From Swiss-Prot:
Its main location: membrane. One of its GO terms (cellular component) is cell outer membrane. The lineage of its organism: Bacteria, Pseudomonadati, Pseudomonadota, Betaproteobacteria, Burkholderiales. Monomer. Belongs to the LolB family. It comes from Ralstonia nicotianae (strain ATCC BAA-1114 / GMI1000). CDD domains: LolB. A lipid is attached at C18 (N-palmitoyl cysteine). It comes from the Bacteria. The keyword Flavoprotein does not apply. Pfam families: LolB. This is Outer-membrane lipoprotein LolB.
C-alpha cells in the first residue's frame, strides 16, 4: 500500500500519473460524505489550495506537489489530494464511524481514526486531525500546545503533538483582528522520531480559498 501511494506522490511531482497508475486512474470516493452538496453550502467549511511536501523514503529525500480540497461539516471531514493535472490520487475521510483512506485501484482502507490509518497504510501520517483546528489558527483542544503570537495576537507558531505549525502568511482582506484573521499559508514540520515517526516530514499549504 505504501508503494501505491508513493507512486501517486511521484505522479504529483512528475505529472505522469497516467503512466504510473495504469490508465489515468483517479480515485472516486466509495462513500462521499458530501455527495449532493453545493460549493456554496454555508454548513460546509471548505479550504482549497496547493500543497508541497518533503519526506524521506528509503533513506532518500523525496518531494511532491499538487492541489488539495478540504471539506468539513460537524464531525465529517474529507481531504482530497490531486495531481497538477487534476486527477484525484488520494481521499481521506473521517466521521463518527471512523476513518477511510482511498487510493487508486485499491479497496478502501478503514480504521478508527485518520492518523493511525495513514501511518499503518502509508508509512507516515499527515496531521489530518490537527489540521481541523490549525487551519483555524488555534491549537487542538485536549493535548498540550505551545503557542507563540505576533504583535496582533495571531499565532506565529503552534507546537503540538510532535508538529510545529508556522503561520507564514495571512489573507489580506482588510481585517487583521485575531478573531477574523484567515490563514493564507502555513508550513508544518515534524522531526524524525516525533511520535514514533520514522522520518522527518515537511508540508506547505497555500490556501486559495
Amino acid at each position: 500500500m505504501a508503494t501505491v501511494f508513493s507512486r501517486a506522490l511521484g505522479a504529483l511531482v512528475l505529472g505522469v500519473a497516467c503512466a504510473l497508475l495504469a490508465g489515468c486512474a483517479s480515485v472516486r470516493p466509495a462513500n462521499d460524505l458530501f455527495a449532493g452538496t453545493q460549493d456554496g453550502d454555508a454548513t460546509i467549511t471548505r479550504y482549497q489550495g496547493r500543497f508541497s511536501a518533503r519526506y524521506v523514503q528509503d533513506d532518500a529525500q523525496q518531494s511532491a506537489v499538487g492541489s488539495f480540497l478540504w471539506r468539513e461539516r460537524g464531525a465529517d471531514v474529507q481531504l482530497e489530494l490531486m495531481s497538477p493535472l487534476g486527477q484525484t490520487l488520494a481521499i481521506v475521510s473521517q466521521n463518527r464511524q471512523g476513518a477511510t483512506l482511498e487510493l487508486p485501484n485499491q479497496p478502501p482502507r478503514r480504521a478508527a481514526e485518520v492518523d493511525t490509518l495513514m501511518q499503518d497504510a502509508l508509512g507516515f501520517s499527515l496531521p489530518v486531525s490537527g489540521l481541523r483546528d490549525w487551519l483555524r489558527a488555534r491549537p487542538t483542544p485536549g493535548t498540550p500546545a505551545r503557542v507563540a503570537r505576533d504583535a496582533q495576537s495571531r499565532p506565529e507558531t503552534i507546537e503540538q503533538n510532535g508538529w510545529t505549525v508556522h503561520y507564514v502568511a495571512w489573507s489580506d482582506d482588510g481585517d487583521n483582528s485575531t478573531a477574523n484573521a484567515r490563514v493564507r499559508r502555513l508550513d508544518l514540520d515534524r522531526p524524525q522520531g516525533a511520535g514514533g515517526a520514522p522520518g522527518p516530514l515537511s508540508v506547505r499549504l497555500v490556501l486559495d480559498q
